[in-house]
């Protein structure tokens, strides 16, 4: 019998499809020392997250967790990986942006989002109404806002000026606009 044909039956053969965890020597020593403490293994934990300073997370995926029976002290075995939630959120936002832009491109390629939505800038410009003087003028506040510059004239503030000074709305509006939206100066001007 030659050495090539020799087959040694070993009881430690691992069946196909089985998962085997190989532990380092220091980890085996730590496990053996912890067995003497009477720790109970906690089943069903799939992820352990430890928060460190500056929102840095230590994440242990598929850990082995043991609990001390006398206190709320847990011992976790597994490979810890550093995870930064800020960078993870940024990557997730980039992925969402890419997915939404891809969906928009696909919708645009299929003819737009809805019926009647312009497919190009030229179509949008052709559909835009022309601005001529026969169009009805916008109501009160919008006209005042465009005439008064970069601030908005609100009817509540005009009514407050009228109540404080006793003048009519036209004078209150004029004072408010001349004071560039400063409510107190408009009231002081009219008194």
UniProtKB/Swiss-Prot annotation:
Q: Which InterPro entries match?
A: EGD2/NACA0like (IPR016641), NAC-like_UBA (IPR044034), NAC_A/B_dom_sf (IPR038187), Nas_poly-pep-assoc_cplx_dom (IPR002715)
UniProt lists compositionally biased (Low complexity) regions at 127-139
Query: What SMART domains does this protein map onto?
Result: NAC
One of this protein's Pfam families, by short name? Answer: UBA_HYPK
Record has Thylakoid as a keyword:
no
Query: Does the record carry Metal-binding as a key word?
Result: no
Please state every residue range assigned to the domain named UBA.
Answer: 153-191
Residues in domain NAC-A/B? 24-89
Q: Which Cys-Cys disulphide bridges does the record give?
A: none
Q: Which UniProt keywords apply?
A: Cytoplasm, Nucleus, Protein transport, Transport
According to the record, the residues making up region (Disordered) are 126-149
Q: Which GO terms describe its molecular function?
A: phosphatidic acid binding; phosphatidylinositol-3,5-bisphosphate binding; phosphatidylinositol-3-phosphate binding; phosphatidylinositol-4-phosphate binding; unfolded protein binding
Q: Name one GO cellular component term.
A: nascent polypeptide-associated complex
Compartmental location: Cytoplasm; Nucleus
Q: Which GO terms describe its biological process?
A: cotranslational protein targeting to membrane; protein targeting to membrane; protein transport
Q: How does it assemble?
A: Part of the nascent polypeptide-associated complex (NAC), consisting of EGD2 and EGD1. NAC associates with ribosomes via EGD1.
Under PANTHER family, the record lists: NASCENT POLYPEPTIDE ASSOCIATED COMPLEX ALPHA SUBUNIT-RELATED
Q: Give the protein's function.
A: Component of the nascent polypeptide-associated complex (NAC), a dynamic component of the ribosomal exit tunnel, protecting the emerging polypeptides from interaction with other cytoplasmic proteins to ensure appropriate nascent protein targeting. The NAC complex also promotes mitochondrial protein import by enhancing productive ribosome interactions with the outer mitochondrial membrane and blocks the inappropriate interaction of ribosomes translating non-secretory nascent polypeptides with translocation sites in the membrane of the endoplasmic reticulum.
Q: Which family does it belong to?
A: Belongs to the NAC-alpha family.
- In its UniProt entry, what is this protein called? Nascent polypeptide-associated complex subunit alpha
Protein's organism: Cryptococcus neoformans var. neoformans serotype D (strain JEC21 / ATCC MYA-565) (Filobasidiella neoformans)
Phylogenetic lineage:
Eukaryota, Fungi, Dikarya, Basidiomycota, Agaricomycotina
């Amino acid at each position: 019998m030659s050495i090539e044909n020799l087959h040694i039956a070993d009881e430690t053969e691992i069946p196909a499809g089985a998962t085997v965890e190989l532990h380092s020597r220091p980890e085996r020593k730590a496990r053996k020392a912890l067995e003497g403490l009477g720790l109970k293994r906690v089943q069903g934990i799939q992820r352990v997250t430890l928060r460190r300073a500056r929102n840095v997370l230590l994440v242990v995926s598929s850990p082995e967790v043991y609990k001390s029976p006398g206190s709320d002290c847990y011992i976790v075995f597994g490979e810890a990986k550093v995870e930064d939630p800020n960078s993870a959120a940024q990557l997730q936002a980039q992925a969402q942006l890419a997915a939404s832009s891809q969906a928009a491109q696909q919708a645009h390629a299929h003819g737009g989002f809805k019926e009647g939505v312009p497919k190009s800038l030229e179509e949008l410009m052709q559909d835009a109404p022309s601005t001529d003087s026969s169009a009805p003028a916008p109501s009160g506040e919008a006209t005042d806002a465009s005439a008064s510059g970069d601030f908005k004239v609100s009817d509540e503030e005009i009514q407050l000026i009228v109540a404080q000074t006793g003048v009519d709305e036209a004078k209150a509006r004029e004072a408010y606009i001349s004071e560039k939206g400063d409510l107190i100066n408009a009231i002081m001007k009219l008194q």
